[in-house]
Amino acid sequence: MKKAPAGSFPAKPTIAPERPILVFDSGIGGLTVLREARVVMPDRRFVYIADDAGFPYGNWEEEALKRRIIELFGEFIANYDPEIAVIACNTASTLVLEDLRRAYPSVPFVGTVPAIKPAAERTSSGLVSVLATPGTVKRAYTRDLIQSFASRCHVRLVGADGLAAIAEAHIRGESFDEALVMAQIAPCFIEKDGKRTDIVVLACTHYPFLVNVLRRLAPWPVDWLDPAEAIARRMKSLLPARSDDDEFHSQDDLAFFTSRKPDYAIRRLMQGFGLRF
């Protein structure tokens, strides 16, 4: 497996900046969470970290991936001293969130888990599908959420192999085969006893980048449930309120890629999000 080169993280500034909010994902999907977080907290500073050297996480053996993420966060925390860390990746959250909290108890961690509870509260038909990576689908954590919050619903788990990579291609402006997307989402749509699936939970932060494509390809309209706004509100709730007297050293929001080799399209995308390398 590819690993980030040793000593690849920028040195911590000598003048302490405002402690940032760290947003972490395996790729660019976490930008959907960053976008909502900025709406909720426009006065905060962010550092976006993509573990593109390890992407896609679905190809990893679980224990090896756990070790990788825990080790990476040791570097991130030492270099950026985050006020809070957000795991903007369902696969990583369902696998390693509790391990991170134990390893770094001084840092509050917010995870991204499938929005099964709000889906169960909103559905009219009782037919809900969860569109996720195969790793998220197979985790006991996901099934525990269904048992706890959606036991009265019919919940179908749909493991989409490769859809996150298609989303990355789409956001880069690259072409892709829509038939492949249709094949991935088709199992989400169920008709039973005169009722139809009315909510599809987007249980991967990459998928909202495809939502317009998903709406167009869907056999009937559904609510594509994106948890990013709820995650942003949770982040804000864990941070101390600011007063007008608070003063901070003004610094840009940053982006860091573990490969240290983001291509031109990704650099342009990050700049479009106001992130500096």
From Swiss-Prot:
Which Gene3D superfamilies does the annotation name? 3.40.50.1860
Binding, substrate: D25, S26, Y57, G58, N90, T91, T205, H206
Please provide, alphabetically and separated by semicolons, the GO molecular function terms listed in this UniProt record.
Answer: glutamate racemase activity
Name the pathway it acts in: Cell wall biogenesis; peptidoglycan biosynthesis
Q: Does the keyword Ligase apply?
A: no
**Transmembrane parts of this sequence:** none
Annotated keywords: Cell shape, Cell wall biogenesis/degradation, Isomerase, Peptidoglycan synthesis
Return the EC number. 5.1.1.3
**UniProt keyword Isomerase present:** yes
Q: What does the entry give for GO biological process?
A: cell wall organization; peptidoglycan biosynthetic process; regulation of cell shape
Recorded hits in InterPro entries, A to Z, give: Asp/Glu/hydantoin_racemase, Asp/Glu_race, Asp/Glu_racemase_AS_1, Asp/Glu_racemase_AS_2, Glu_race
Main enzyme class: isomerase
Give the annotated active site: C89 (proton donor/acceptor), C204 (proton donor/acceptor)
> According to its UniProt record, which reaction does this protein catalyse?
L-glutamate = D-glutamate
User: What NCBIfam families does the record tag this protein with?
Assistant: glut_race (TIGR00067)
Q: What does this protein do?
A: Provides the (R)-glutamate required for cell wall biosynthesis.
The UniProt family comment states:
Belongs to the aspartate/glutamate racemases family.
Tell me what this protein is called.
Glutamate racemase
Species of the source: Brucella canis (strain ATCC 23365 / NCTC 10854 / RM-666)
